[in-house]
Amino acid sequence: MKKASVLMIIGPLFLLGLFVFPLWNIMLGAPQYPEPLGINIHIDGIRDVNEFDIQNIDGLNHYIGMKTLPKPEDMWEFSTFPLIIGIMVFLGSLIGLLGYLGKVNYQWFIGWFLVMSVLGVMGMYDFNQWLIDYGTNLDPNAIMKLANPDGTPMSYKPPLFGNAKMLNFDVSSLPSTGAWMMFTGMMMTVIAFFTGQRAHLLKSKK
């Protein structure tokens, strides 16, 4: 159980990487841009991949009626997500410490993982809703008004995950370093659960 508890203490600490590294990355490539434009989405705001990328993206979006990219104060998520991550890191490592001291059993480990998974799904849903609003809620007075073949207004929603073609841009939307660190930490808590379960079964057979 002690080995499982050590894994449970360490696993949630990987989520601290979200305070340093981006969670998600969106890149836009086109022939007129030798170096693609990109944004890194952190839990506390959106930042350029290269200097002036946000400024250039906002400039392009202005012509087709899209909103400017939000600043941290424009979205409640950018103040709430760091708080949630901090709480989950504290609770996860506390559960691991209590497990090491024999105060809780291994089932608490998977409980933390399930709560974190639900929060992750909710976060992805919220992110997708923002992408929908960002790509479809266009300014009716935009300089360029493009329509689909059926006459409906064209959507500029970036993909939630993967690649897509938008006008002459190739757009990619993929997890970044922070997301992979979070995934690694969460998988460590799953391993901690099964390690603790195995130790419990071996102990009960003696």
What do these predicted ranges mean?
Residues 2-6, 92-122, 189-206:
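Juxtamembrane interface at the cytosolic side of transmembrane helices
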Residues 119-131:
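Juxtamembrane membrane-interface segments at transmembrane alpha-helix termini
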Residues 64-71, 91-99:
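Membrane-helix exit/interface motif
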